[in-house]
Regions:
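Charged, amphipathic alpha-helical segments and their flanking helix caps
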Residues: 1-29, 39-123
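A solvent-exposed, acidic/Ser-Thr-rich amphipathic alpha-helical stretch
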Residues: 33
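Conserved beta-strand in the GNAT
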Residues: 36
């Protein structure tokens, strides 16, 4: 049985261990910079004969620093921290494929936003 909340929890723990404020829902008093665990998408994996699920979790990085440096640095730290697949395991489920999907850094209304997509497969 797949438990999406356990993966979100493991990602939350990983991000907070890096020293970032991490939210599912951003409180009004949130201080920049912070990371939001955004949309979660999942589907049955194609081309597999066993019970495999592909999961994508979007991370949103928000900063009011002038320029992209802070968002770039946070994005780099997150990418480097997820190099070890074992850190994202949750319960009995086996994580066997991990990568970063579409990602971007943009300026929106004076605030810099980085968007990182974590793609992984579990069975």
């Amino acid at each position: 049985m797949i438990n999406l909340s356990s993966y979100q929890g493991a990602i939350y723990e990983k991000l907070t261990s890096l020293g970032y404020n991490v939210y599912d829902e951003v409180p009004e008093e949130a201080k920049f910079p912070y990371v939001v665990i955004g949309d979660i998408e999942f589907q049955e994996a194609q081309w597999h004969f066993e019970d495999v699920l592909d999961i994508s979790i979007n991370l949103l990085i928000w900063s009011i620093w002038e320029g992209k440096k802070e968002v770039n640095d946070i994005s780099s730290n997150i990418i480097n921290s997820f190099a070890d697949l074992e850190d994202v395991k949750a319960g009995e489920q086996s994580l066997y494929k991990f990568s970063f999907g579409n990602s971007s850094i943009k300026r929106l209304d004076g605030v810099y936003n980085g968007s990182l997509t974590l793609d992984f497969s579990v069975k």
